[in-house]
Every structure is written in C-alpha cells, then in structure tokens.
C-alpha cells in the first residue's frame, strides 16, 4: 500500500521536470565545422530508443547512442532540432521529448566575385588582371584562404594564396568564360564565383571588297552585289559601302564575317569606284577601291577624272592671256592707220587702169611711214562704187610698197594721199582719188 502511494506522488513530479535537452556544438557553428548533436537526459539519466528531428521531421534513430554527427556544417544545416527517448525510472520507463534548439550556421565567407582589370573587354595586347575577391568572417579571420582560377573547364592556376591572375599581352584567343574558386586551408568549404566573360577586342583587318555581276559589264537594269569581309576583328563589325567617297549603304555583322549589298543599276551614275569600310570598337579600315564599268558607258564618274580640276583654272588663264594679246595686237594695228579702200573686182570684159594710192602716217615728230598700193580699175566700176565695203576681199592688188620718210620729207602731220594714172593715155581710164 505504501509503494503505490509513493508511485502516485512521483508521477506528477515527472510531468513538471525537463528530462531531456538537446545540445549542438561547436557554438557558434560556421560553415565547414563538424556539427554534432547530443540528446542528454536530466542528470545524465540513461536513455534508449533515441530519435532526432529537424524542423519537426524525423532525422535519425539510435537504440543506445545519444550523439549524432552531422558532418561538415553548411548553410543548409540550419534549422530547429529536437530529440526524444525512453527515460528509465525505477520501477517504470516512459518516453520524453526535448525542447527544440535553434542551430544557426554562420557563413565563413561569402561567394567570391571575379573581376577583370581594367575591363572585361580589353584591347588586344593590353595587360589584363583577374581578381578574385571575398572576405572571412571576423570571428574566423585567422584562417588562410586559397584561390584557384579556371577558364572554359580548364585550370589556369591551382590553389594558392594569391587572389589575382595576370594575363600579359592579351590575345583574341584569351577570350572566354572565367571563374575562380576559394577554399580555407585545410577546410572543406569551397565556393565558386559566377562566371565572367572576357572578350579581347582585336582591331579589324583591312576588308576585301568583291563585285559580283554577270560575265560582262553590267548594263542599266542589271543587279550588282558587293561583298565585304574583314578576315579578323572582334564583333560586332559595322560595314559601310562607298561610291566615290559617298556612302551608299551599311550593314552590321553582330558575329563578324561577311556582309553584302545588292542593288540594281539605275543609270551611268552607278558606275565608278566602290569601296567598303569595316569598323569595330577598336579600329576602322578601308578596302582597296574596285572599279565598276557599265556596258556602253563613255564616261565613268571615278576619282581618276579629278585630275582635270586643277588644270581648269590654268586653261582659263591661258585663254585670257591669248585674248589679251590679240586685243593688244588689234589695237596697235588700228593705231597704225586705216588701210586703203578695197576695190571690188572689175566686171568681165571691162578695161582696167592702174591706181596708185599713197597713205602717209606720222607716228612721231621725227618719223613717218608711207603706204603705197596699186590697183587697176575701169570706168565701168564707177557705177558700183557705192557697193564698196571694207569687208570685201576680192580686190586685185598689183603692188604695194612701204617707205619710211625722213623728217625733211614730211612738212606736216597730216595724211597726204594722192593717186596718179599710168603715163600711157587710156581712153577709158581716169584719175581716181582715194
């Protein structure tokens, strides 16, 4: 009777006592630490049938062992843990469950970040530095981190203490996807950076222009295709087409390679020197010009005809000099005095007589010139004397004489003209005054 009374008094005390509790160590827990859970009874009370739970879900069962090794802790190891087990009290055994314990796993260092200096798109031949950056937790700053670098699935540098990798004289072949990995020395944590694309910018080579048309020179209405290609150069590449330095079209090649321009020949103005230009972020190059001739065209608008431009002013100047010389000559000829009146040709069968005409012209005080002209005329021509004009050139000149007079022979500056007939008397001839 006394035994049952003692048991009844003991049971309420059991309900009020925390018989189990869960411990996690180390504390605090960092990534890579060996995480251990221990389910312990009050005052080291023996336990059996121990079960572990995380976030209310069954995790592990052990008949006798009260300790559970979780291995290297990770961020995914965080959670609320608890345990349960059978507690043995004389003379009975009952099952108890511990309170939950929150396990926080601290990040040892954040994932690294890879950067390229001075730029992930460096110019060909420049120095490129890859830098892998991260930082240890202040409570674990005494650890030593090791760095490794990789590209397109290949290891460029094994683990070492240097967080940088230098690429001297970058080439187009150095373009690709890079990343780095960081791990503490002797630890099991390893973190990888996001991939970084490095694109080495190579200058474009001189493009090659090709003309495609029929076997013969194209005519108006035919189609002509221009192909432009730069053998090397980092994309994207912008291609521009020119006709005699005037742009006629452009195309972009996002991946590089060849681009084309197709157009119909509309007129002879489509003939000339064609060229193309390739340009990227580094350089710009122009191709050799290609001449397009049209069938039956006489004149091509090509830069070769530009040589006429510098000679045009010289030609005009030469013409002006010749015109001025002619003008001076005509004016000096006119100052020399008018020529005698021209005599029209005599009518057929008419009698002719000689006609002498002297013209005296004094240019200065001490000199003079006498012009003598001999004509033959007849009386029948008198009726047509009104038709005489200066523009007639068919008069018959028998002889002409130019004689210079001395000052003693000239009495005045007036012009003295006289005419005389032949000494032989002619019935149909008469004296004519000019």
Swiss-Prot record:
Q: Which GO MF terms are attached to this record?
A: MHC class II protein binding; phosphatase binding; protein phosphatase binding; transmembrane signaling receptor activity
Record bears the keyword Nucleus: no
Where does the protein principally reside? membrane
Which residue ranges are assigned to the Extracellular compartment in the record's topology?
20-307
Modification after translation (UniProt): Phosphorylated on Tyr residues. Tyrosine phosphorylation induces association with phosphatase PTPN11, PTPN6, INPP5D, INPPL1 and GRB2.
Q: Which UniProt keywords apply?
A: Cell membrane, Disulfide bond, Glycoprotein, Immunoglobulin domain, Membrane, Phosphoprotein, Receptor, Repeat, Signal, Transmembrane, Transmembrane helix
Q: Origin, by domain of life?
A: Eukaryota
Single GO biological process annotation from the record: immune response
User: What causes induction of this gene?
Assistant: Down-regulated upon stimulation with mitogen phytohaemagglutinin (PHA) or concavalin A in peripheral blood mononuclear cells (PBMCs).
Keyword Transcription on this protein?
no
Q: Residues of the signal sequence?
A: 1-19
Q: Where is this motif: ITIM motif?
A: 369-374
Its biological purpose? Acts as a MHC class II receptor. When stimulated on its own, does not play a role in cytokine production or the release of cytotoxic granules by NK cells and cytotoxic CD8(+) T cells. Does not act as an Fc receptor.
Free-text domain note: Contains 1 copy of a cytoplasmic motif that is referred to as the immunoreceptor tyrosine-based inhibitor motif (ITIM). The phosphorylated ITIM motif is involved in PTPN11 binding.
Q: Mind telling me what this protein is named? A: Fc receptor-like protein 6
Question: What organism is the protein native to?
Answer: Homo sapiens (Human)
Encoding gene (name): FCRL6
């Amino acid at each position: 009777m006394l035994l049952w009374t003692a048991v009844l008094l003991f049971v309420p005390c059991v309900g009020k006592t925390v018989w189990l509790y869960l411990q996690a160590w180390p504390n605090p827990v960092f990534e890579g630490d060996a995480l251990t859970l221990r389910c312990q009874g009050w005052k080291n009370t023996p336990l059996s049938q121990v079960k572990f739970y995380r976030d209310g879900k069954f995790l592990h069962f052990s008949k006798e062992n009260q300790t559970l090794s979780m291995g290297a802790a990770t961020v995914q190891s965080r959670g609320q843990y608890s345990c349960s087990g059978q507690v043995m009290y004389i003379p009975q055994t009952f099952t108890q469950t511990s309170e939950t314990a929150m396990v926080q796993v601290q990040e040892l260092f954040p994932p690294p970040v890879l950067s390229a200096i001075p730029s992930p798109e460096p110019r060909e031949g420049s120095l490129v530095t890859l830098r892998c950056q991260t930082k240890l937790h202040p409570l674990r700053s005494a650890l030593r981190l090791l760095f490794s670098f990789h590209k397109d699935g290949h290891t460029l540098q094994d683990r070492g203490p240097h967080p940088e990798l230098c690429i001297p004289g970058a080439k187009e072949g150095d373009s690709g996807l890079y990343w780095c990995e960081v791990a503490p020395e002797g630890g099991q944590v390893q973190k990888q950076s996001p991939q970084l694309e490095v694109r080495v910018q190579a200058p474009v080579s001189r493009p090659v222009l090709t003309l495609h048309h029929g076997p013969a020179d194209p005519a108006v209405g035919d189609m002509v295709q221009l192909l432009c290609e730069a053998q090397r150069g980092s994309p994207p590449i912008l291609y521009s087409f020119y006709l005699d330095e005037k742009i006629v079209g452009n195309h972009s090649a996002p991946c590089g390679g060849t681009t084309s321009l197709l157009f119909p020949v509309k007129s002879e103005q489509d003939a000339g020197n064609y060229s193309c230009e390739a340009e990227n972020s580094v350089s710009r190059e122009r191709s050799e010009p290609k001449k397009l001739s049209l069938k039956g065209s006489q004149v091509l608008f090509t830069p070769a005809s530009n040589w006429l431009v510098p000679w045009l002013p010289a030609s005009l100047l030469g013409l002006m000099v010749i015109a001025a010389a002619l003008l001076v000559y005509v004016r000096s000829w006119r100052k020399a005095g008018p020529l005698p009146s021209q005599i029209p040709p005599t009518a057929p069968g008419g009698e002719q007589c000689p006609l002498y005409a002297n013209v005296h012209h004094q240019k200065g005080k001490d000199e003079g010139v006498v012009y003598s002209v001999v004509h033959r005329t007849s009386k029948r021509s008198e009726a047509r004397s009104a038709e005489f004009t200066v523009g007639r050139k068919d008069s018959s000149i028998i002889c002409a004489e130019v004689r210079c007079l001395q000052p003693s022979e000239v009495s005045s500056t007036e012009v003295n003209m006289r005419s005389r007939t032949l000494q032989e008397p002619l019935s149909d001839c008469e004296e004519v005054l000019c």
